[in-house]
């Protein structure tokens, strides 16, 4: 039987396409199918490194995990990573191809279309079902002639399309009808039904609107997915950060993450959202407060974001907190900022060839055009301060960075013991003599349950807070919960009929 395709498009960005694709991948896997996700082109700063060292959008890695398969560059052949100068780094089949402004990019898309087609065909040859995710809206008038991710891919894959709208933000009926009105008759024929997402309230009160929508468009409503918070799955859009709830209680650890303008891979910190931790993202002095732990996350534009910290007055505050004993952790670009200086002689990141860092670690970073992307296995090398008792804990993660950092202090953060390429036995990152300032290039560190649980226990001890039981997120359980929610609220018999062209028992 030839492989089948199903495509999820949305009325806008952040309506729930990525999560729905992950849930459908899980359902198809549970039902015995070999299923893979696919997104022709993704624009995101949250990325993932595959086993072969290729970089793809984090959402496709999550979807592959939900499908029970290894992520591949073919699942996201084109990744755009916005940079500080209104250009984007173009990543093709997992590797950096070039940096282009939008006006330059569109002359490059005919070549990309061939690569997209080859990747799609690769998946179709190896899986029973390919669930395809669109981007933004298929009805963007200014982009329709040049887009390579929505209806053009639907035509290429001969994929039936389900259109999803977000009712939580209001205007879902107008957005769905407006989308249909702006599509051509041929494009409308691809859309086989609608899904209403993030609904709160009484479904009976929604029924008149659903009836009107079906009557006006001639397309069925396949389901109404409720708004949920009890399922923790990595998110891709930074809009997600705006929706974080801040809670506090006696005995709670207060963890502040600096929300850099070009923050990337913020899903690094999802495991810190557990009972007993108040995780918050801060952008200015008025929000920073008195945290128990301060984190500088990864960024796509280290120099620009370091300038931002200085302009906002955050740089001296961060340095002052570290000097007063508040632990500070820097990941990737955040690690680079913690050092003495950053040099950019080739102008890889900016027009500046040098900038002073925060001076909390005795490190120097030199940018070059080579981008390092690899998965790693490592052991914690630090054994003082915040990391006392954590030495030799094994962790896994991945590196995605430009530039090399030298450590004049000599105290590394981690000892890398294995990579897929065979490169191993090297040291990563740096730690201050006090053990309270820690920097590393390794993303995904907090996704290692033993490391995170023991780190938080040590932090509570240092801050004079009572010990609590720790927990870790079971990702497989979360994917199953997501599948349960979708099965319960989506007409899966209709979805199977649309996908296979017949009823599926």
Which residues are covered by each model-predicted region?
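Flexible phosphate-sensing "switch/lid" loops adjacent to ATP/NTP-binding sites
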Residues: 1-320, 327, 344, 369-370, ...
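Catalytic nucleophile serine of serine hydrolases
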Residues: 332
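Extracellular/periplasmic helix-exit of transmembrane alpha-helices
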Residues: 339, 343-350
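Conserved P-loop NTPase catalytic core
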Residues: 350-374, 380
């Amino acid at each position: 039987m030839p492989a089948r395709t199903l495509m999820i498009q949305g009325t806008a960005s952040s309506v729930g396409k990525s999560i729905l694709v992950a849930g459908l991948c899980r359902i198809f896997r549970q039902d015995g199918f070999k299923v893979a996700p696919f997104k022709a082109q993704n624009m995101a700063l949250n990325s993932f490194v595959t086993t072969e060292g290729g970089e793809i959008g984090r959402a496709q890695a999550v979807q592959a995990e939900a499908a029970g398969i290894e992520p591949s560059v073919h699942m996201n052949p084109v990744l755009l990573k916005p940079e500080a100068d209104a250009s984007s780094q173009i990543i093709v089949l997992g590797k950096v191809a070039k940096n282009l402004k939008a006006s330059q990019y569109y002359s490059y898309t005919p070549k990309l279309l061939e690569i997209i087609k080859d990747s799609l065909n690769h998946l179709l040859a190896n899986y029973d079902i390919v669930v395809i995710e669109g981007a933004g809206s298929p009805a963007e008038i200014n982009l329709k002639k040049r887009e390579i991710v929505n209806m053009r891919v639907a035509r290429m894959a001969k994929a039936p399309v389900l259109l999803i709208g977000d009712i939580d933000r209001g205007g879902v009926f107008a957005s769905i009808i407006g989308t249909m009105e702006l599509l051509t008759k041929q494009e409308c024929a691809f859309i086989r039904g609608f899904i209403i997402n993030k609904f709160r309230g009484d479904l009976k009160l929604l029924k008149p609107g659903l009836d009107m929508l079906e009557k006006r468009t001639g397309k069925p409503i396949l389901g109404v997915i409720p708004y949920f918070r009890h399922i923790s799955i990595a998110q891709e859009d930074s809009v997600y950060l705006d929706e974080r709830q801040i809670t506090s209680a006696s005995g709670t650890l207060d963890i502040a993450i600096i929300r850099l303008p070009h923050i990337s891979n913020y899903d690094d910190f999802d495991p810190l959202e557990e009972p007993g931790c108040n995780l918050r993202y801060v952008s200015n002095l008025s929000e920073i407060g008195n945290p128990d732990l301060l984190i500088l996350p990864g960024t796509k534009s280290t120099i620009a974001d370091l300038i931002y910290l200085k302009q906002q007055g955050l740089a001296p505050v961060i340095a002052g907190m570290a000097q007063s004993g508040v632990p500070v952790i820097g990941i990737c670009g955040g690690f680079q900022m913690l050092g003495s200086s950053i040099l950019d002689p080739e102008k890889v990141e900016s027009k500046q060839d040098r900038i002073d860092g925060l001076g909390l670690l005795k490190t120097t970073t030199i940018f070059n055009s080579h981008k390092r992307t690899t998965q790693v296995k490592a052991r914690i090398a630090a054994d003082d301060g915040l990391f006392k008792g954590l030495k030799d804990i094994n962790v896994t993660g991945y590196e995605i960075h430009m530039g090399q950092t030298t450590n004049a202090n000599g105290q590394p953060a981690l000892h890398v013991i294995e990579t897929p390429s065979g490169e191993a036995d090297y040291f990563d990152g740096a730690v201050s003599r006090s053990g309270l300032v820690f920097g590393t290039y390794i993303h995904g560190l907090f996704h290692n349950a033993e490391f995170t649980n023991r780190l938080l226990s040590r932090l509570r001890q240092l801050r004079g807070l009572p010990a609590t039981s720790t927990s870790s997120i079971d990702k497989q359980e979360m994917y199953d919960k997501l599948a349960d929610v979708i099965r319960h609220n989506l007409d899966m018999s209709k979805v199977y009929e649309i996908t296979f062209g017949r009823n599926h028992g």
